[in-house]
Amino acid sequence: MLYGKMNLGLLVSAAIFSAACSGGSKKTAMGTYAYDRAFFAERGIETLELTSEDGASRVLVIPAYQGRVMTSSAAGDTGDSYGWINYKFIEKGELNPQFNPVGGEERFWIGPEGGPNSFYFKKGDEQVYANWKVPAAIDTDTYDIRSQSGSSVCFTREFALRSASDRVFRIGVERTIELVDRDGAEQTLGAEIPGDVKFVAYRTNNVITNRGDESWTRDSGMPS
């Protein structure tokens, strides 16, 4: 059995030095973390949050979007929302048979996207955009929660993908998202974060496992 690992490491928001909004009147203003959380709640889309002890660092995750990090904040509910969200597409409430670009900040993806071992084209189809289709396993499937705490969550999912060479790959995914505290962020960055700087940081670890009977090789193809 072969295990494939993808460690995306630490993400510290590029807006680490941005000033946070304040005041009750700003709580649900567009562009804030609270606004985006409410946007999903109003549409019946389940979310879960990873939150620091002081409530300032927040990460919003959606199981139905493959355990995707949709957005984050360095200053709680009233802070800037750092993720890009495709409001218009989500508001339509319709699935696109080719690809559903809901947006987000960090997600699980799988390759190859092109070539004889691509998971995005059928055997015999010309590999052009019109024939490109994202597998449901990384587009519309809900990932299961294996474990969860206030600062981390672990998702799992098993599925089968058929390549452009008509070979079936049975894949298990374990995806962990973990909020990183100040000490952890400083260790990763190799630098001290000033006490007056608001920040949010998290790391993800994605492990793919061969659940089939045949080995994955360079010649026969393998997920990337």
What are these regions (language model features)?
Residues 1-10:
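Bacterial N-terminal signal peptides that target proteins for export
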